[in-house]
Curated annotation (Swiss-Prot):
Bilayer-spanning residue ranges: 11-31, 35-55, 82-102, 115-135, 145-165, 181-201
Protein name: Na(+)-translocating NADH-quinone reductase subunit E
Coiled coil: none
Subcellular location: Cell inner membrane
Reactions catalysed according to its record: a ubiquinone + n Na(+)(in) + NADH + H(+) = a ubiquinol + n Na(+)(out) + NAD(+)
EC assignment: 7.2.1.1
Subunit structure: Composed of six subunits; NqrA, NqrB, NqrC, NqrD, NqrE and NqrF.
Gene name of the encoded protein: nqrE
GO BP term, example: respiratory electron transport chain
NCBIfam families for the chain: nqrE
Species of the source: Dichelobacter nodosus (strain VCS1703A)
Length: 203
């Protein structure tokens, strides 16, 4: 249990997708203007990461990797791990499509607010990175579930904090040359420096 808790904390704070690895920054900067929209997208990312990382773990273990379980049962040794990227993106696209249909039907206001950025979750590098890190680190199915939740929560936390800061900055006297994305990049950098303080924690 302690191992899973350590993995969860590590994936949220120490290895934060947005502020440690700088993944998913296009969506991170574009949707962090309002805190309500940021929380909505952050929740969507948590759901997608929580589902896709363990699903892709099963896909990798049972089908893709060298001497996978399926091929062992068939008595052949096949390595189709080179299809990993296409397979992972396919799983992510399917999950995002289901989520998009769900939001369109049950939460239309959030669906309209997210607009084009919801289908763009499919090609959000932070989402794909979750599955790639899972394979690289050879996580078990249980570890994949924990890592999926943690990496999604970490990204959602980062975008929610950024949105809160940007809403406050509307009332700040920002220099003319730094208005808009200029001050946003500086803020993201300062937040990343803050998250660097977690890197000294040994778990």
């Amino acid at each position: 249990m302690e191992h899973y808790l350590s993995l969860l904390i590590k994936s949220i704070f120490i290895e934060n997708m947005a502020l440690s690895f700088f993944l998913g920054m296009c969506t991170f900067l574009a949707v962090s203007k309002k805190i309500s929209t940021a929380i909505g997208l952050g929740t969507a990312v948590i759901v997608v990461q929580t589902l896709t990382v363990p699903l892709n773990n099963l896909l990798y273990v049972y089908l893709l990797k060298d001497n996978a379980i399926l091929w062992q049962h068939l008595g052949v040794n096949v390595d189709i791990s080179f299809l990993g990227l296409i397979a992972y993106i396919g799983v992510i696209a399917a999950v995002v499509q289901i989520l998009e249909m769900f939001l369109d039907k049950y939460v239309p206001a959030l669906y309209s607010a997210l607009g084009i950025f919801l289908p763009l979750i499919t090609v959000n590098c932070a989402i794909l990175a979750g599955s790639l890190f899972m394979v690289e680190r050879n996580y078990t199915f249980q570890e994949s579930m924990v890592y999926g939740v943690g990496s999604g929560v970490g990204w959602a936390l980062a975008i929610a904090v950024m949105a809160g800061v940007r809403e406050k900055m509307r009332y700040a006297d920002v220099p003319k040359g730094l208005e808009g994305l200029g001050i946003t990049f500086i803020t993201a950098g300062l937040m990343a420096i803050g998250f660097m303080s977690f890197s000294g924690i040994q778990l």
